[in-house]
Amino acid sequence: STLLASSAASDVYKRQVYTKTLEYEDINYSVASAEDQTAIFGGWSSWLNYFDSSLPFQLSFVNRRSRSGSRYKVNISEADDRFNSVRTEYTGMLKNQIAKSNNGIERAKYVTFCIPAENVAAARPRLERVEADVIGNFKRLGVQSQPLDGRERLALLHGQLHPGSREPFRFKWADIAHTGMGTKDFIVPDSFDFRQSRSFRVGQTWGAASYLQIMASELSDKLLLEILELDAELTVTMHIQTVDQVKAIKTVKGKISDIDKMKVEEQRK
């Protein structure tokens, strides 16, 4: 699935892989002052540096068309006073404004990290430790985050596999024992069609996948924002595997050596 961590070095995956997914909120980077943007960028760099070479992770940005009954997150808690009716009315107004400004597109952000382990019992303590660290690091950035449980992850994948559909997600853990089916049976669409070379079909919806290779020496910090602001249902994923510093330096030196050889060969022509 798109929310499971991507494959990395084979030696990391000789054992089973266990994952966790967190949903996190946005940070107002684009409207911040230049000074605040610098601080946010530094904090984000520190957040990324937490993940070492043994902890691959994936960032997922999911844009989906809102359905009737879907709820935008507006956190205005009720209080023990006589103004709750005003709060309710104001919350409804904000949700309507958000829906209009987003053209009906709901935008969600996730981070999924994975660890190799012999079994669930061995994986759980480290997963929980990493989860606590990641949530704490988010909090230092002023970003709220929360883990998804198994059912919430299934619901998310169900939405990914039923784009444009109004089919509700129906699943309870007890259903597995009652039906004998696995979790995948509850989220799979009625059909897949991969006969086209540049597109595919999931149920009644057509889609396409693209791979972006960044070769530019400079990259605008607005690139991802501009992609995610497209008025379309789309998913952008970043598969990130930190490289050990010694190995990275060796790789860079090797690339420089290759470039020097190419220069010499060109000069001989």
Labelled PLM ranges:
Residues 1, 6-269:
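Extended, folded cores of ATP/NTP-driven motor/assembly subunits in large transport
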